[in-house]
């Protein structure tokens, strides 16, 4: 879910990222493990694209889903070009779209791997992702990180020298758990409205749903 400008008037303007590790069971059905999540407010376009490319490589991702309407269109364009990482000196090769011929034509490298899902929201699509997410949660097909209240114990058990890290380093490791808790709160506080046999989701005044949108897109694509 893409938003590039933070807003003082609205609390719903943030780019939300979820990383999903799919694990099949003996029947071939997959469980979605949301192993990482992050929210970025006020991030500039080039920095967001670089962040996505770093995560795509580091986590060995197979696909990336982008909310391609509006502000997501320039993100799509930049992902379809080479991206230089000034920290590592590496140049990430172009990626192409896998589900939208119009975006595929915009990629200058026709041999680039087709791994980007362009999400073009509509009333029907929003209805479908809402139903899919609800069903996935009810059937236990989505697993989240543990509560932020338990994360220090988990991190201490899995990261050698955790207690010697700086407060900033500890907070960076805790943030995925904190953002997971915030995502769950969003899900609890959403309001659902049925119009013309389609479900519309909207947030209560002062609440937000950027994490919900990213999570629902992620699960639907997976």
Task: Please provide the spans of the model-predicted regions.
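RNase H-like, metal-dependent nuclease domains and their acidic two-metal-ion catalytic environment used
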Residues: 1-101, 127, 131, 144-148, ...
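Long, structured stretches of catalytic cores involved in phosphate-ester chemistry, encompassing
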Residues: 94, 98-117
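Conserved RecA-like P-loop NTPase helicase motor core
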Residues: 113-132, 136
């Amino acid at each position: 879910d893409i938003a590039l400008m933070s807003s003082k008037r609205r609390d719903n303007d943030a780019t939300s990222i979820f990383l999903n590790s799919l694990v099949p069971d003996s029947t071939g059905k997959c469980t979605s493990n949301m192993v990482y999540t992050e929210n970025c407010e006020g991030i500039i376009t080039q920095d967001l694209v670089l962040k996505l490319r770093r995560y795509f490589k580091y986590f060995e991702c197979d696909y990336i889903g982008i909310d391609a309407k509006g502000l997501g269109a320039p993100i799509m364009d930049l992902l379809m070009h080479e991206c230089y990482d000034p920290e590592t000196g590496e140049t990430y090769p172009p990626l192409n779209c896998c589900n939208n011929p119009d975006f595929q034509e915009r990629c200058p490298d026709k041999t680039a791997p087709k791994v980007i899902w362009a999400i073009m929201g509509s009333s029907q699509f929003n209805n479908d992702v809402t139903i899919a997410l609800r069903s996935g949660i009810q059937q236990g097909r989505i697993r989240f990180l543990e509560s932020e209240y338990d994360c220090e114990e988990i991190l201490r058990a899995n990261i050698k020298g955790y207690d010697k890290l700086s407060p900033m380093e500890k907070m960076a490791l805790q943030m995925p758990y904190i953002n997971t808790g915030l995502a769950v709160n969003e899900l609890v506080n959403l309001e659902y409205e049925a119009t013309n046999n389609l479900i519309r989701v909207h947030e209560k005044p002062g609440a937000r749903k950027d994490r919900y949108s990213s999570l629902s897109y992620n699960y639907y694509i997976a």
